[in-house]
A protein has these predicted regions:
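Asp-box/BNR beta-propeller blade signature and adjacent active/binding-site loops
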Residues: 1-224
């Protein structure tokens, strides 16, 4: 309630969301979101008896007191990020062990059912690495359009070429003229995006010059 200056005692929610038969359950990594209706959502990944990882979400409708999980979005996926692309519609953007490109799915019922997105396994290349995704409403950015912002190593082999991309059509396309290369050299590739103000997006990422780098980028430098 005070912008992170003080914190309550931690609460262990493992028993609420983890099936006892699973080997483990992890969040993101990255960030969670608050939906328009106040629902808290975090991306998750778990490994069950098949020993194959699965990405999904967990959510809370009471301010984090209790949490629930339904079904995974796609099997053989791990680190994911979630964004609300329309009121009540969540998009999960996933690291896919099949290599080559990101898996993307949407849900209208908090993960009870999932639909593969048209961009899945085609629009966003990756070297099998974590990525970041945020949704920004038109009223909250200088472009005056609902946008998605994405960052990852923009390659299919090796972790380099950390790039920020913007989609103006709900993630269907990520055009070359709406991208900005931040770091072309080898790095660990993880990143996390946030809006600083209406004109500027911030990115915390593992760069080639430091373990962690924070950079402020003007949206109009990405969308040309």
């Amino acid at each position: 309630t005070d912008d992170g200056k003080t914190w309550s005692a931690p609460i262990n929610i493992t028993g609420q969301v983890k099936d006892p038969s699973w080997y483990f359950l992890l969040q993101g990594p990255g960030r969670g979101i608050t939906m328009d209706d106040g629902t808290l959502v975090f991306p998750t990944q778990f490994i069950d008896s098949t020993r194959i990882p699965n990405a999904g979400i967990m959510y809370s409708k009471d301010g984090g007191k209790t949490w629930k999980m339904h079904n995974y979005a796609r099997t053989n996926t791990t680190e994911a990020q979630v964004a609300e692309v329309e009121p009540g519609v969540l998009m999960l953007n996933m690291r896919d062990n099949r290599k080559g490109s990101r898996a993307v799915a949407t849900t209208k019922d908090l993960g009870l059912t999932w639909t593969e997105h048209v961009s899945s396994r085609s629009a966003l290349q990756e070297p099998v690495c974590m990525a970041s995704l945020i949704s920004v409403k038109a009223k909250d950015n200088i472009l005056d359009k609902d946008i998605l912002i994405f960052s990852n190593p923009n390659t299919t082999k090796g972790r380099h070429s950390t790039t920020i991309k913007v989609s103006l059509d709900g993630g269907v396309t990520w055009l070359p003229q709406h991208q900005l290369l931040l770091d072309e050299d080898n790095n660990w590739g993880y990143s996390c995006l946030t809006m600083i103000d209406k004109e500027t997006v911030g990115i915390l990422y593992e760069s080639s010059v430091a373990q962690m780098t924070f950079q402020a980028v003007k949206l109009k430098d990405i969308v040309k």
